Each structure stands twice: as structure tokens, then as C-alpha cells.
Amino acid sequence: MNALTEMKCEACQADAPKVTDAELAELVGMIPDWGVEIRDGIMQLERVYKFKNFKLAMAFTNKLADLAEAEFHHPGILTEWGKVTVTWWSHSIKGLHKNDFIMAAKTDQLLD
């Protein structure tokens, strides 16, 4: 179990601080299967999940949708045959907040 999965997302306003470099290094270590990507100057977390078919990929996507609604924090999701690409970032601050790491860990937990 990951300590991040026990945490809840907090409301993230436009003036909320992005994670620092030190926090980034620590938090990334807690979600080793995730990569850090920069798109349009915005740092994001991304992971590709593999499945045996489209139906399983879609079932995972639906579980993730339920989780996102419960936490009121929503990812980018690309569902394809046999895989789901999930991208977390905080839109309001155009970067990474601790919420994104919490949600990445909780997304991983959906596989259990």
C-alpha cells in the first residue's frame, strides 16, 4: 500500500503552489510506474496501462471515471484497444500539485 492512496485531494485554486523540485523527486519515487512529461510547457504525470482487450480497457476507464468524480479531480484519458493512457496534472495551476500524485497512486490501486 502506498501512503498516497490514504490521502484525499484538496481543492486546488489558481494560486495553489506547484510541487517543488524536492517534492517532485520524493513523490515520483512513490509512483515508480509513472513518467513525467512536459506538454506545452506543462508538467504532467503519465502512465500507459495494458489490457487483453478493449472491453477490459473500457472497464478500467469507467472505474477511473468513478474515482475522478469521487475525488473531484479529473485526468486526461485515452482508451484504445488493449491500453489506456492516463495523464494527471492540475489544470488550474498548469502543472503538478500533490493531488496529481495522490490520484496517480489511486489509479494504480484500481488494478488490484
Curated annotation (Swiss-Prot):
<dbReference type="InterPro" id="IPR036428">
    <property type="entry name" value="PCD_sf"/>
</dbReference>
<keyword id="KW-0456">Lyase</keyword>
<protein>
    <recommendedName>
        <fullName>Putative pterin-4-alpha-carbinolamine dehydratase</fullName>
        <ecNumber>4.2.1.96</ecNumber>
    </recommendedName>
</protein>
<dbReference type="InterPro" id="IPR001533">
    <property type="entry name" value="Pterin_deHydtase"/>
</dbReference>
<dbReference type="GO" id="GO:0008124">
    <property type="term" value="F:4-alpha-hydroxytetrahydrobiopterin dehydratase activity"/>
</dbReference>
<dbReference type="InterPro" id="IPR050376">
    <property type="entry name" value="Pterin-4-alpha-carb_dehyd"/>
</dbReference>
<comment type="similarity">
    <text>Belongs to the pterin-4-alpha-carbinolamine dehydratase family.</text>
</comment>
<dbReference type="Pfam" id="PF01329">
    <property type="entry name" value="Pterin_4a"/>
</dbReference>
<dbReference type="GO" id="GO:0006729">
    <property type="term" value="P:tetrahydrobiopterin biosynthetic process"/>
</dbReference>
